[in-house]
Amino acid sequence: MNIREYTSDVARAVAFLSRIPVPASFFEGDDGKLARVSRAFPLAGLLIALPAAITFGVLLAFDADPLMAALLALAIQTVTTGALHEDGLSDTADGLGGGKDRDRALAIMKDSRIGTYGAVALILSFGLRAAALAAIGRGLAPLDAALTIPAAAVLSRGAMVWHWYALPAAKPDGVAASAGKPDYGPMQIALIAALILSAFLLWPSLRLPAFVLCLLVTVVAAFLFTRHVRQRLSGHTGDTIGAAQQICEIAAFCTLAMCV
């Protein structure tokens, strides 16, 4: 693997997955395709999660209420990402919840208006993550608690790449189809990076059993969601890729909260 190319992929992934400004030099010769760039999603997720993690850790170190610290960290994370994945979760919930068949579900997902299912999904997403982070903040030292945020970001970004790889594009003219689909190589690199980075972040404070359980629950969540999307839509969309990230991040946080 060419390190220079991988560095460029990380920068492009950060630009795609967040609102963090990236120097234009990293986009020279860029064709806009994300198939190869997807291998850098886990590391990019770690970098994107740093502002939220620092916020969470500093607030806990100053004895802030863990729930308040968790909500502020999630607010920082949402601003950093531009609610990219939350938007995908909301649209996917509306489509799968309100669409009686595949075509109707895809049409609903394309509609920018939020429906009941989407609103409930967002409330549950923020509520579950905030509750889990608050529990983590009460059970771990500030630094160890803060490291769970990039760890969940890493695992969920790896899971979204696998979801993207495992399914064909549901719409040939959709955004996800135009961005390209990861090949086996980039997908494998993304999963290996997610495994190594999450182990480095979690193992020192939570030890092997908690890390393995978190990994297993995240894998199961990704598999079950991907299977459901395959049955309902016969393929992925940009929205389902974002929803996969959110679902797996929730799964990781909730599992870690039960292990502290």
From Swiss-Prot:
EC number: 2.7.8.26
Cofactor list: Mg(2+)
Keyword Endoplasmic reticulum carried by entry: no
Cystine pairings recorded for this chain: none
Bilayer-crossing regions: 40-60, 117-137, 147-167, 186-206, 209-229
Recorded metabolic or biological pathway in which this protein acts: Cofactor biosynthesis; adenosylcobalamin biosynthesis; adenosylcobalamin from cob(II)yrinate a,c-diamide: step 7/7
Keyword Magnesium: yes
A single GO cellular-component term on record: plasma membrane
Keywords tagged on the record: Cell inner membrane, Cell membrane, Cobalamin biosynthesis, Magnesium, Membrane, Transferase, Transmembrane, Transmembrane helix
One of the record's GO molecular function terms: adenosylcobinamide-GDP ribazoletransferase activity
Functional description taken from the UniProt entry: Joins adenosylcobinamide-GDP and alpha-ribazole to generate adenosylcobalamin (Ado-cobalamin). Also synthesizes adenosylcobalamin 5'-phosphate from adenosylcobinamide-GDP and alpha-ribazole 5'-phosphate.
PANTHER family associated with the record: ADENOSYLCOBINAMIDE-GDP RIBAZOLETRANSFERASE
Entry's family note: Belongs to the CobS family.
Protein name as catalogued: Adenosylcobinamide-GDP ribazoletransferase
Source species of the chain: Rhizobium rhizogenes (strain K84 / ATCC BAA-868)
Gene for this chain: cobS
